[in-house]
A protein has these predicted regions:
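M16 family metallopeptidases and their MPP-like homologs
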Residues: 1-25, 44-52, 123-125, 130-163, ...
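Polar/charged alpha-helical tracts
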Residues: 68-72, 232, 278, 282
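Proteolytic maturation boundary segments
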Residues: 5-149, 295-297
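A generic local secondary-structure boundary/capping motif
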Residues: 36, 284-286
Length: 298
């Protein structure tokens, strides 16, 4: 686009310098005044439209119903949002410190191998590929393959449900707030043959990243509100999923290639009724019960 339109392609440093110059010229009262022009109190510049699926039996919104919904929202008295952030550490009670029980240098590939007192294996390798970034991965053999086909729905939802859950004493929303200003993330996932933890951070936020990893092993917090929100998103997506020849063919090919393994059947809306949050959390505990099974690379 920049090449075709003959526009300059700014570097991150140049963009930062320009923003430093422009931001002081935009005080909050100027922004508020601009918003008043965009959102007129007289509603003179408002366009309301609705998109939905066209199918038999669908009840469609009318002009009157859309206008009423808008007017009702306008009439609501909304209290100012109060952002309550928990003022407590990510880990409430610090665990007993472990130890490095052995170290080995691998000169051929340029990494150091550590064995920790909990049995975990750690591979450390410093590179100059991307300054200021620390990449973290941990893996253990197992994964979905250890579970029966009757667990299919919970296994299919596992990754998303865990990412929507909280950690420690923090719900999913509270966790996002307490991590504001920090550049650290960790995820727990369950593919077919392994369980993985992965993350990244800046050097100054390494402790936060390791704390999050510790909590994924010891204290994933159940967040019913976030879980219900996720299930509703799945319902909407699966309900409106277009039945196409391509998707049917792909499902059949996948099912055949995996020897008719029931765990490979695509999710349907009715399957969501069998989703069990407690069981998903139990599976997470089972797969992270023994850190000695894991090899971590940093």
């Amino acid at each position: 686009s920049n090449y075709l339109e003959k526009e300059p392609l700014l570097s991150i440093e140049q963009t930062y310098q320009i923003m430093q110059q422009l931001t002081p010229m935009l005080p909050v009262d100027v922004v508020n005044e601009a918003m008043k022009q965009l959102i007129s109190l007289s509603d003179s510049n408002v366009v309301i439209y609705n998109t939905t699926t066209e199918k038999e039996g669908m009840v469609y919104s009318t002009e009157a119903s859309l206008k009423k919904a808008y007017d009702d929202a306008r009439a609501e008295k909304i209290e100012a949002y109060v952002d309550n952030v928990k003022q407590e550490p990510l880990i409430a009670e610090q665990p007993k410190a472990g130890k490095i029980v052995s170290e080995k240098e691998n000169a051929k590939f340029g990494y150091k191998e550590l064995t920790l007192s909990n049995g975990a294996r750690v591979l450390l390798k410093k590179t100059n590929l991307k300054e200021g970034e620390v990449l973290f991965n941990g893996s253990s053999k197992g994964g979905k393959s250890l579970y029966d086909a009757k667990e299919r729905v919970n296994l299919d939802l596992f990754n998303d449900v865990i990412s929507y859950s909280g950690l420690g004493n923090f719900s999913s929303t509270e966790l996002q707030k307490v991590l504001a200003g920090k550049n650290a993330n960790v995820n727990l996932s369950l593919p077919n043959l392994h369980e993985y933890v992965s993350g990244s951070c800046t050097p100054k936020d390494m402790e936060t990243m390791f704390q999050m990893n510790y909590l994924y092993f010891t204290n994933i917090k159940k967040d019913e509100q976030a879980f219900n929100s996720l299930i509703n998103q799945y319902r909407a997506a699966l309900k409106n999923k277009s039945p196409s020849a391509e998707s049917a063919l792909q499902d059949s090919v996948t099912y055949t290639l995996h020897a008719h393994d029931a765990r490979q059947i695509s999710l349907e809306e009715k399957d969501l009724d069998n989703a069990n949050y407690d069981r998903i959390l139990q599976i997470a505990k089972e797969r992270t019960a023994n850190a000695a099974d894991f090899t971590f690379t940093i």
